Amino acid sequence: MEQNWTNPYKNISLTPYRLIAAGGGHSKAVLPDGTLMGASDLKRQLKYPQLFAWNAERKELDNWNKYLQENPGCGIDLVVDSGAYSAWSRGKLFDVDEYIDYLNADKLIDTCFWAAEADVIPGSYGVDPTEEERLAAPQKSWENYLHMIERVRFPKKIVPIFHMGEDYKHLIRMLTYQFKDGDFIPYIGISPRNDMPVVEKVKWYDRTWKVIYDTCKKVGREIPLTHNFGCTTVNIMEQYPSCSSDSTRWLKYAAFGLILVVVNSRTKSINVSNRDLLNPNHINNQPLSVRQAIDDVCAKFGHGLTLQKIVEDDKGDYRALFNLFSLNEWRKDFKYAGTPEFKEDLW
């Protein structure tokens, strides 16, 4: 197999922001004006970047790979997740070589924007990892990364991942590693812990980006493109100069009766179900400004969609479509608002 060692990210556009709507969603829903629309239809219309785990969402991934090969100029980025967490949480062994074979098959690695490394989760699901397991996981992840880049057709599309709680020496290693052609790794994943409050994530991001800038300056390399795994906290995305973020919130929140709307750089989750009517986040208890923001999104979406129609939708399909459209309104108007030092090289 001949490998292509070119950097696929030279001179890529950073706008609109690559907010990746992970997950599939419903197939088709009848909108108030009679239009049939599924989540995939809206994603294609809005040119939403996509992310699917190869071992848990293979059908969706294969469908999108085929669509992008048939529509090469559609402007949609496809990201492949390793699914390592999914396998770990189910107690299944992860086969790195099977993952590599899948990436090389059907030209998926050619089509995709990037593919995540096979990162190693310490310990077993539901059991606290030992200190030895916690310290060994980043090294095993790095070994998997090195194994992968020697065996896929586009090595520079493999993204290594730095996790919250890991020693910063592992991030520095990613930033200073050079391929055999002398290039540095162009795209790096940053993964905060979802069980940590936002204030703690912000502290970690501050330190992480300081390490990125200090290290890049020291070795004389450009600031890498970065991806925030499992993060759609708007103020974090606006504060730090990442290239992309992914989350399934649009889908998961819809399933629990919630819609998402961005107000003053904050993502508000609004309960529009007939449960928890006294909850401060219920639509009945929202100020006029929030209701107006929801009405504005509905008006831009069109197809007769209104807040009342969303409330009356028992299946949650309207909520999912609203969430996709609402977050897209934010991403297409994205403005970096962070530290000037962090902004200078990327934004």
Annotate the PLM regions.
Residues 1-153, 282, 287, 295, ...:
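Non-catalytic, usually N-terminal nucleic-acid engagement modules in DNA/RNA processing proteins
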